[in-house]
């Protein structure tokens, strides 16, 4: 083998090693959506109130809890009580796979997430399409408690920039007490602010045609959630919230968040 061919082989082997063992930022990053990818508020003819209640002040929140049961291999059940409305005392959170459920099964965790009641099943005896009394369901929303909080009860501010028709119209901060926080928690807090300040969701519809919330991690990876319901006259809360089942977490100190909205007359 001549020298030039040997060098070429070495370069090729080195390149293969990089591909196999170096995290591929671009492959893991979700590109920004095109307009055609986003749901349109005008195409939804049901009540937007059913979306609004998912991001109001009645989310599930608990600290230092352990799972007490499960229904399926990829979910966990917790004894968590609704202290505001007294609607439930048990919460089932469903995860993407059995591996995630096993990861948190015997851990002391914090739970924070948007919940639903219709099509919430704790056993095979629950009636399809009915509300199960004293119980509620969610997806993801789990973080380990030990070592995941700031000293002295300090809170981390997370900046959120809002763009309406591509123009930065408002910026605000939400707070979390967690170092590693679920994207779901930050999403809930961001949308809650926008409901109160910008009427993001109204009873029948929304002043906005499209919307998505984008998370930018410290390594450059990005991902987003569509903020509008799918077309049609019915909104399936369980199906919509399923986007949180991967229990995606971000570093609260470094994550950047953008909300992109377009108005109906924009």
From Swiss-Prot:
GO cellular component labels: extracellular region
Chief location of this protein within or outside the cell: secreted
InterPro entries per record: Enterotoxin (IPR008992), Staph/Strept_toxin_CS (IPR006126), Staph_tox_OB (IPR006173), SuperAg_toxin_C (IPR016091), Superantigen_bac (IPR013307), Toxin_b-grasp_Staph/Strep (IPR006123), Toxin_bac (IPR006177)
Subcellular location: Secreted
Keywords assigned: Disulfide bond, Enterotoxin, Secreted, Signal, Superantigen, Toxin, Virulence
Signal sequence annotation: 1-27
Cysteines engaged in disulfide bonds, as pairs: 120-137
Gene3D superfamilies: 2.40.50.110, 3.10.20.120
GO MF: toxin activity
Family named by the database record: Belongs to the staphylococcal/streptococcal toxin family.
Function field: Staphylococcal enterotoxin that activates the host immune system by binding as unprocessed molecules to major histocompatibility (MHC) complex class II and T-cell receptor (TCR) molecules. In turn, this ternary complex activates a large number of T-lymphocytes initiating a systemic release of pro-inflammatory cytokines. Inhibits SEC1-mediated T-cell activation in the absence of MHC class II by competing with SEC1 for binding to the host TCR. Also causes the intoxication staphylococcal food poisoning syndrome.
Complex formation: Interacts with host MHC class II molecules composed of alpha/HLA-DRA and beta/HLA-DRB1 chains.
Protein name: Enterotoxin type C-1
Organismal lineage: Bacteria, Bacillati, Bacillota, Bacilli, Bacillales
């Amino acid at each position: 083998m001549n020298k030039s061919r040997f060098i070429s082989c070495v370069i090729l082997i080195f390149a293969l090693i990089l591909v196999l063992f170096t995290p591929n930022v671009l492959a893991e990053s979700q590109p920004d959506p095109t307009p055609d990818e986003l749901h349109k508020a005008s195409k939804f003819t049901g009540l937007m109130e059913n979306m609004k209640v998912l991001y109001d002040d009645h989310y599930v929140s608990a600290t230092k809890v352990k799972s007490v049961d499960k229904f399926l291999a990829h979910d966990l059940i917790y004894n968590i009580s609704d202290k505001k409305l007294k609607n439930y005392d048990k919460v089932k959170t469903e995860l993407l796979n059995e591996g995630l459920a096993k990861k948190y099964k015997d851990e002391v965790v914090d739970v924070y997430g948007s919940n639903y009641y219709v099509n919430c099943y704790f056993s095979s005896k629950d009636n399809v399409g009915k509300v199960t009394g004293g119980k509620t369901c969610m997806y993801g929303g789990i973080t380990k408690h030990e070592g995941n909080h700031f000293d002295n009860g300090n809170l981390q501010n997370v900046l959120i920039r809002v763009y309406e028709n591509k123009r930065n119209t408002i910026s605000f901060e939400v707070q979390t007490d967690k170092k590693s926080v679920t994207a779901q928690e930050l999403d809930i807090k961001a949308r809650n602010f926008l409901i109160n300040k910008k009427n993001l969701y109204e009873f029948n519809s929304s002043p906005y045609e499209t919307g998505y919330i984008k998370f930018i991690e410290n390594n450059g990876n990005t991902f987003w959630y569509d903020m509008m319901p799918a077309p049609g006259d019915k909104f399936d809360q369980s199906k919509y919230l399923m986007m949180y089942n991967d229990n995606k977490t971000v570093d609260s100190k470094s994550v950047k968040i953008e909300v992109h909205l377009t108005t109906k007359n924009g």
